[in-house]
């Protein structure tokens, strides 16, 4: 009798623990962040196609889309463009693009976006007309409030010298941020020296004209918008019950996937103090932006990794990044077919690489694990909503 009682107690404890685990999973807030990097957006495009494919298999639903699984999707520059593609609704109120459409999009439009060189030394390298034309044609009059999930797309206003973050949650207090997604796409990708800044206007709650003078979102968040995306999620937690589990910065209840566009292994070659002692403005201009972006991206990853590890939730954060780009693949604006094919190979090879030196788990395996969590969480939320 005592043995039977002990077994029953053990079974009860296991069931209680399992139930608690699944309840916790159902309350998790999920965030996807995509870096900037121009044509190198092909790399996260490959990763997203793999992830969405896994979700479709697990849920036996060919129409499953990333926006169905993530509470917040954020991006800057080319990552902002991808964010708009997978969150903007089509005529059937489903995402304009599936993840499998991302890479073909770059192959079709990339050569035109990066082919209209102005040839001016004292002006932007490209005129930006095609970069503006494509979002206008594809996304039309769709605005931020219509996004199928929360978004976090960054830009920088050169007139006010302030970052501008386009999110659905800000619209109640700042309705002027309800801009057209096509304007946002150009603005977040308008990298200084590459494309002209973008001007457009919206209306305030009083009907007054509100003007924007915007450039690339990387100026506001540098290339990695992961912290921005998490910040948007935590701010929503104060008002939205669906985000309540991450109030007070409870990162244990946060599932974060951050996708990079690759770093330049050649740039990782060090410079000595003696070598740079006589550098002038021109020499520093050639490397200072890369240094700043690389350092900021590294520190963002370092901070997030540290926070999740300290909370014993390191499996809740995955940074997918290729750190050994070489040759033409390092260039944000080389949209030649040969280079784009190389970027596809980089993305496909990255899936087979280990997540870290200390772990045998590959990115492919880690993404499958993430997909399982996303799938289970979605089912739990759906079941809860049905009661």
From Swiss-Prot:
The catalytic activity of this protein is classed by the Enzyme Commission as: 3.1.1.-
Q: Which GO terms describe its cellular component?
A: vacuole
**UniProt-recorded name of the protein:** Patatin-13
Q: Where is this motif: GXSXG?
A: 75-79
- One Gene Ontology term of the molecular function aspect: phospholipase activity
Give the subcellular location: Vacuole
Primary location recorded for the protein, binned into one broad class: other
Return the similarity comment. Answer: Belongs to the patatin family.
Q: Which PROSITE patterns does this chain map to?
A: PNPLA
- Species of origin reads Solanum tuberosum (Potato)
Report the residue ranges where the short sequence motif DGA/G is annotated in this entry: 216-218
